[in-house]
């Protein structure tokens, strides 16, 4: 039995802190709380009306995937991780993660509601798990892992792949729109959400390091490469990024680059050994690393939650 999963009679009381690294992650999550009301999407409609039909199609489908996926992540947290993990510090993090995933889902739903006026099309997008085969494939993979009989360690990797790999290409595609100066509300919310998901991914890596009997490197590689191929197909075949003027081969490479960052953070050898083909993603990740806890708006932080000495925190995964 893993210590973090062993019955813990002290789980109802937070102090004394036993796992300081996990507690620090919780405090970082707490410091970065935000709400949809902080994002101004009023200026997006002008840009939206100027987009080509292909660009609109792409954005709507990406938002439809995102709107559903946060709910799947939360179902896993509620049904599995929150009941399995017995240490208080991790339960604090998971509880906070559930709250912020709800905010992500609300944000994506609000964006769809703002951009799409036709009620039938809205329903189609809000029910993407049933209505869109390309979204259903990713959702099915994630849902399969909620109910899988595999141990906590394997499922931890699978959901790190969901948040670290399944979201990566879509985040990059929205940052591409930012590079073009389009859709300030969408791109600002994307910054906030990608930052949150980076922290969730880092937390999964931290929990993995607390396992005494983690899954084998072979198992980890299998799960990650599986997620990579599904994400590559999603953004180069089902919903090709060429619709918004991005290069599909570069997107494939970018997803491999992200997967290498994740598997390295888990303590294993890289699989693909590729460099980041998107210079604009390098700049964004560096910005986030240097300013993460210095500004409230854009690089948000609740005042006074974190002390000054914690300002050096950097995201190990690119979002």
Swiss-Prot record:
Gene3D superfamilies: Ribonucleotide Reductase, subunit A (1.10.620.20). Its cofactor is Fe cation. Residues 313-319 are annotated as: Interaction with R1. GO terms for molecular function: metal ion binding; ribonucleoside-diphosphate reductase activity, thioredoxin disulfide as acceptor. It catalyses: a 2'-deoxyribonucleoside 5'-diphosphate + [thioredoxin]-disulfide + H2O = a ribonucleoside 5'-diphosphate + [thioredoxin]-dithiol. It holds the Pfam family Ribonuc_red_sm. Binds 2 iron ions per subunit. GO terms for biological process: deoxyribonucleotide biosynthetic process. Keywords: Deoxyribonucleotide synthesis, Early protein, Iron, Metal-binding, Oxidoreductase. Its EC number is 1.17.4.1. Interacts with RNR1/OPG080 subunit. Can interact with host RNR1 supunit. Ribonucleoside-diphosphate reductase holoenzyme provides the precursors necessary for viral DNA synthesis. Allows virus growth in non-dividing cells. Catalyzes the biosynthesis of deoxyribonucleotides from the corresponding ribonucleotides. Belongs to the ribonucleoside diphosphate reductase small chain family. This is Ribonucleoside-diphosphate reductase small chain. It comes from Monkeypox virus.
